Amino acid sequence: MVKGIEIFQEYFKEYTDQYVLIGGAACSVSFEEQEINFGRTTKDLDIVLIVEARTKEFGEQFWKFIRDGRYRIRAKSNGEPQFYRFDKPEDERFPKMIELFSRTNYMLQEENGLTPIHIDDSVSSLSAILLNDAYYRALLDGREIMMGISVLKPEWIIPFKAKAWLDLKEKQDVDSSDIKKHRNDIIRILADMPLQKCILPEEVRNNMRMFIEQFDVTESELKNLRIRGTKSEDIKQALKDIYLD
């Protein structure tokens, strides 16, 4: 379980319609719901605000969470989507890092004292994905309440990780481990979670097709993920069955 997820749930139990937890933390919650170990540690919560539902009260509660956790690093990027990063809480019950995305301008209370932040390739990729209307629609379609937390369901996490993988592969000077992380998460989800077929927006579906065409994993890499008896072609076929049929 992601450190601090319980206290996050406690603070935001009345606001599950106003955000979605995505990324590795969402995977971890989904796996925990099924009493399965996700297989990798994630220290941060990636949160997307639902712009149609957000309220002043959510902003007030969010900032209370930051104050109560006594986060020592508080930063904000320029441009859209808005991106906030809160890191190194003094209260160890709180998540180690929170990354908050908003598609449109959303003024958090008490923004004085936020330092400018330069976003890295992985954040830049996710920001671009969230600005895309088709992916935002998929985000809304794929959310579910698990353990009192609004999360992106496993079968809907995969298209986002596939798009991030495609984007990072096109960039130069990107750490290969960042690229493999998304692919490996997809493999873990397919191997361990019961998944439903998804009807994706056309653009998302086309990108899934591109990902499947480019997907490859060696037998040795699968063994390192503790997955045996499965080949690369088996994974590609499973993805086709869920997203393309």
Predicted regions: what is each one?
Residues 1-245:
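Compositionally biased terminal segments of proteins
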